[in-house]
């Protein structure tokens, strides 16, 4: 996702290395930090396990490309899957179950798919190239 945005912000074409339907769990960095701090602050008595999954959303590569082109209408994004990289993505789960974290220490992400891109990633990457 960041590579797509960086290329779009620089008016460069981007060839995505996975299929459009490739899906992976995703979260904004502020939510990752929030999860670490939330787990560290949780009362030990509330924790039912030592390891927790946390997630926010699971977009496909096509979902990400659509979001990027909605913000950068001249973006040129194509899909040219590379077998080795596609196999890595295919070996990962498309979604992560974070229900135990939600139950034990009230985990919930602040950033939705749209907010991650429109309020966090895209503005920060645009600002980087505006310098």
PLM region descriptions:
Residues 1-15, 25-26:
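Oxidoreductase cofactor-interface core, primarily capturing Rossmann-like NAD(P)-dependent enzymes
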Residues 17-20, 25-131:
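C-terminal substrate-binding subdomain of Rossmann-fold SDR/epimerase-dehydratase oxidoreductases
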């Amino acid at each position: 996702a960041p590579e797509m945005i960086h290329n779009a912000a620089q008016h460069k074409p981007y060839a995505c290395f996975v299929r459009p339907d490739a899906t992976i769990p995703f979260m904004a960095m502020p939510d990752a930090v929030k999860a670490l701090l939330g787990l560290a602050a949780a009362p030990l008595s509330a924790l039912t396990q030592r390891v927790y999954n946390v997630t926010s959303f699971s977009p496909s590569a096509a979902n990400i490309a659509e979001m990027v082109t909605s913000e950068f209408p001249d973006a040129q994004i194509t899909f040219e899957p590379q077998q080795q990289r596609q196999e890595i993505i295919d070996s990962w789960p498309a979604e992560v179950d974070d229900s135990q974290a939600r139950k034990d220490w009230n985990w919930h992400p602040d950033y939705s798919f749209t907010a991650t891109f429109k309020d966090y990633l895209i503005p920060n990457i645009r600002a980087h190239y505006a310098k």
